[in-house]
């Protein structure tokens, strides 16, 4: 396999999360060749100099800047973007909405045999990329992996690790419930909200396929391993945690990522998954959450009036806020040994000791890029998921290189859920 000028190229470096990803690469100083790609050399270089100052590194450590536009309207623009893609082994990108800025990039990565990762939280984009480019990626060996940030690594990998434990015990993982804890008042990022508003506000134009592309298996056929999603539609009482839990804006994205992982990795032919976000039980916080949800809904249907009150793409919290943030994803599962007729409860806890909507997401993406680099030429290609493409390697890297810990046991009590409206 011929060598290339770069191991990794980062797209989106002028955005808030892209800058954090660049900072992480500079701080870690991994022994790789990497570059950034942007539309404007001046803007990118100005941003890089500020990032270097924050990271405490000299200008000599700054990456080269390649120039290309992610939205190509001329043959010249397409040629420039393809030239950048062809120079690298792995592409990582924070530039969204990905349905707008990722389509051509994924296509070129699949065609050039270049592995790709993004921080998308867009199921429509994911489905479309499977339908359009999975066969090409399988042929060229490109690993195309959306959902490599806070959407959806913590949830997808929690389920994966439970399944791996079940397999080691000669059993089958049949059910997982996840319960998510954020600091009170945590909302979605500006980029995530813009993506959600873009997705919900646009005219749906689904491609016609014989079956849901999420169910496509590693050979391109319809998988027999399906997932029933039973996430609550309203707030419920979660007995184990003595708190209310309920739906949130990104839970369908997590569930669809898990659905695809099951189709590829064969957890169970009748797998059941649910997800709830644990909530502060105070009336004041519940009122605040209700108001925030109402504002997001208003911004979707009346963007001219309300969208300006929400965080905008590129906007982010203070450094202190990011460094004191956190996320905990509790997993409660069940594995079944059909030969022995035994059921065993499983318990997991994925903890991130920093904000995950920005800082943690940037670090997850970079570490994903490092795993994809290690797996280059060693794993079959395709449009896949973090669990299927990265496996335990990403959990290990996140624990070694970031403020993340992962715990897994067979002794956890399954959470007791009683449906009861909290408002």
What is each stretch, according to the model?
Residues 66-88, 94-97:
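Conserved Rossmann-fold cofactor-binding substructure of NAD(P)-dependent oxidoreductases
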Residues 47-58:
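Short, conserved SAM-binding/catalytic segment
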